[in-house]
Amino acid sequence: MNRIGQIAVPAKDIERATEFYKDKLQLPLYFNTETMAFFECDGVRLLVSLPEKEEFAHHSSVIYFHVEHIQQSYDELTSKGVSFIDKPHIVAKMGDTETWMAFFKDSEDNTHALMSEVKVG
């Protein structure tokens, strides 16, 4: 194994989820069908889909979306109606780098986060 090719996120309503990832997060849409939508996320394909089986009908793992300017991204997404759980905050400091995060809910109640690594000093 050498890289992640695709990450799946379950949806309850595919139209609502497609709109969220395309319009609010502004991820480029590859294509969609009646049950799924594929997005480009910097070389990793993001699959948003209705679960094929009950065993897949659960919340997704947290996806950490890297952004350059976390406060600016937080403000932009908040203005688009994205529901954040918390505000941007430092979660770790390693040497001269601070790791900042802000967690949010997607339209399907999955938790994801913005993350940014900031050089200080």
Residue map of PLM features:
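N-terminal beta-strand motif that seeds the catalytic metal site of vicinal oxygen chelate
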Residues: M1-E15, R45, S61-I63, S116-G121
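Vicinal oxygen chelate
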Residues: I4-K12, A37, E55-G121, ...
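Alpha-helical segments within the soluble intracellular
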Residues: K22-D23, E40, T78
